[in-house]
Amino acid sequence: MTNWRWWICSLLFVATTVNYLDRQVLSLTYKEFIAPEFHWTDADYGTITSLFSIFYAIACLFAGKFVDWMGTKKGYLIAIGVWSLGAVLHAGCGVATTWFVDGVDSVEALRAVEAGSNIALTVSTVSVYLFLLCRGILALGEAGNFPAAIKTTAEYFPKKDRAFATSIFNAGASVGALAAPLLIPPLAKHFGWEMAFIIIGGLGFIWMFFWQFMYDKPEKSKHVNQEELAYIHQDDEKTVIPSEASESPATEEKAIPMLQCFAYKQTWSFAIGKFLTDGVWWFFLFWAPAYFQDQFNAPASSPLGQGLIFTLYAIVTVISLFGGYLPKLFVEKKGMHPYNGRMLAMLIFAFFPLVALAAQPLGAMSPWWPAILIGLAGAGHQAWSANIFSTVGDMFPKSTIASITGIGAMAGGIGSMIIQKVAGNLFTYAEGQGAAFHFMGFEGKPAGYFIMFCFCGLAYLMAWILMKSLVPKYKPVEVK
């Protein structure tokens, strides 16, 4: 039997890695390079990350339908092309800011502007809008990644293998976040933050070449033999395997209209699970570098800062790979239904983020404790994420998977928008109040971080309870 499906899975892994590298450039250059140049506060950064989330959420609603309409191959190509362009455009924000601010005629002059002056406020405001434009383009393209990847997984893998395949490509998020602190801060330090955006953004254009020549539907791919095709279609009640001589249009499934998708509890179960938990991962992704610099004076470009961020995402990467293996074990060894095995695995993984509650208390002993504990919490999220994505394939026909995934990603983006905005305003307020702001023994900004860690720790158990309440038993959607 050929194993072309795993080569396709590796492409999904690389795309997701590039996706998260592009998303991480701003968070790893914000505190040390961009904030001083454009006079940003945490509230400004929170505004950018929260609006990126809402741009992403809105785009996700249509991205799934777009991928279903365009097809996996073209849809994925367009998505990664758009987000790579958006990533590269960030590099021009400094020059563009000088065009709109009187008295500032060069990028070098931006740093020389007196902090707190009217010109500094203008620089901050103009640059925030320019970055938002670039983040909007980035979000528009990135929204297509997971709908296209999940649709590809449903095309190339039987149900019992989908969570494992999803955990592999979803690990790209962890690997991207893992590689980011090793690549991006040194690039920004030695060549400028603009070059970091250009080099990392350019990786997506390279990926497009491989996708163009390697991907095709399994029924049409010359790299997939009949034995592998039969394995892929083992779940079909009536599997029609097209031969080289004929292809039956009867194998096409009827898609569910977008508005009708909202009539199913299965859609709401998936959407609520994403709404409550996606923002936790994005909080770790966007704020971990700033957290280590604020709390431990460890900038992302310093050896300590790089070590802390690398350790965090190394833990995420290694442990999250078991996210897809555990339900596979339940199905093959315990004889459980794939959906029931997934829900049991998700319950187990929902307990992992609780360790984030100890990040701030143990941080008083060593900065390595928060790195380890946030890493464990992030690993729990990635393992959870691999399985929640796969529940869509359990419940919905393949023709609608990208649309449902887009709805869930939209819900996750809305949840993330709320968390990022709350975090940015909370940190700015807590820093300004100092000792007057306190929570559970912490004062000022550390108290703000502890509040956020408390929510992150509890979000997954709340999500699992609500999901199980909506869909207590396996019940696939029937298209009439």
Question: Where does each model-flagged region fall?
Answer:
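Primarily marks hydrophobic transmembrane alpha-helices of the MFS/SLC 12-helix fold
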Residues: 76, 131, 343-346
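C-terminal ends and interior cores of transmembrane alpha-helices
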Residues: 81-124, 347-364
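Multi-pass alpha-helical transporter architecture, strongest
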Residues: 207-215, 354-362, 449-480
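Cytoplasmic helix-loop-helix junction between adjacent transmembrane helices
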Residues: 134-174
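Residue-level signature of mid-helix packing/kink "hotspots" within the transmembrane helices
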Residues: 24, 53-61, 143, 177-178, ...
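C-terminal transmembrane helical hairpin of 12-TM major facilitator-type secondary transporters
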Residues: 339-387
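Extracytoplasmic gate region of multi-pass secondary transporters
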Residues: 26-30, 262-324, 381-385, 389, ...
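Helix-loop-helix hairpin linking two adjacent transmembrane segments in secondary transporters
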Residues: 173-222
